Amino acid sequence: VVAVASADPGTSLHTLVQTRLEASGVEHPVTAVLLNFRAYDTLLEIGVLVVAGITGMSLSRAGARAEPELRSTNTLLHALARWFVPLMLLLAAWLLWAGSHRPGGAFQAGAVLAAAGVMMRLTGLPTAWIAPGPMLRLGLSAGFSVFLLVAAVGALTGRAFLAYPPLLSGPLILVIETLLTLSIGMILLGLYVAAAQRDGADE
């Protein structure tokens, strides 16, 4: 923000990002902006998403996440799921890794992870982590909590809020994005399950 305010009015934002890209810890300008230069925006967005996920799931019926009516008995879907779910998990991992140097990142990887979870729910594959308990609470909060912890440590050690140590920018961003991927995937899957239950209850 300070760099933009003090820059020549004729200098574009793209140029400013490119001149500081090497210090960001990643090679892709969008990831650099979202996880470094404007990381507090992303932190707030994740906080809103966590609150939305907790609220949505708290409105679903108690114990309903294990109800069998959300599952399909379609044998073709069940057979395809055993092939597609591992491929989707690999795709999510690739999108997460690719985000440092090309389009991708935690949000896209989390969406694919949630889609894999939806397919698992529909075919009856185990999804115990979406049931109420410590695993669900940890998954929902892990990304935001670690993001906030990194921000707080930076501020307490004399740097700006969410300013990473230069030598640790890349590894810290990778850790944050990995945990954000898991949290985003769990939140989206939880909202899908909660919405399906409410639709069934309204009929």
Regions found by a protein language model. Give the residues of each.
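Alpha-helical transmembrane segments of multi-pass membrane proteins predominantly involved
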Residues: V1-E203
